[in-house]
């Protein structure tokens, strides 16, 4: 792929990303054009318009058959994401839809492995955790993805490490294995702090504090969440998840006044996000 897809993506603004991909598509050809269209389809999926995403991908079916490994793997990945992903409501996750997603992700994984596209192989493995949602299964898939990260020398694979360690930590947390979860989250923080994504770095710190609270290390968790509150507020982007944790932390300390204060802030932030 001659075009840097990462530079075109803003996952928080799929409409903006779509426009960027369409502008790039105007001068693209061959596999690059196919790949850009798979990403346009993904922008619709992020907006929960799965029907339009599928329509775009189906229009590529014939051309993808003779395309290279990257285009075929991305096409399969995005087809799977129209059936099972982080944006799908729970009621859509029928056995049939999950099987459609599994088939597509496994096909993407096979293609990516055959094409030595480690980053796409990791993407496919990590998407299988949206099909198999039991914490033990999610841990299994995340550990398999991490094995690919650690064995690969490809930048596209290495860039996944923080996300995959976060996923491992989340599964371990759900399993009540808090010490192990904390280790993974702290390693993810180190990786995030090397990058240039303040939002992802704050989320990584939030995961650490969330786990510290579960371990009874309330004061440490509180210090982190209060710092995160200040950082988000400085950007005029209040985070309801930080407020939720502060509500729980002050509640556990018996400070009902502060707990109620953060409960109100959380409700206000949630209402603001919904409008």
Model features per residue range: what roles?
Residues 25-26, 58-65, 106-113, 117, ...:
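Amphipathic alpha-helical segments of tetratricopeptide repeats
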Residues 35, 74, 123, 159-163, ...:
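Residue register of alpha-helical TPR repeats
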Residues 1-39:
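N-terminal leader/linker segments that initiate helical-solenoid repeat arrays
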Residues 5-13, 42-52, 83-101, 129-141, ...:
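Short coil/turn connectors between adjacent alpha-helices in alpha-solenoid helical repeat scaffolds
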Residues 2, 38, 75-77, 123-126, ...:
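TPR/TPR-like alpha-solenoid signature
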Residues 31, 70, 119, 156-159, ...:
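Residue signature of alpha-solenoid helical repeat architecture, marking inter-repeat boundaries
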Residues 19, 55, 96-99, 103, ...:
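Primarily a tetratricopeptide repeat
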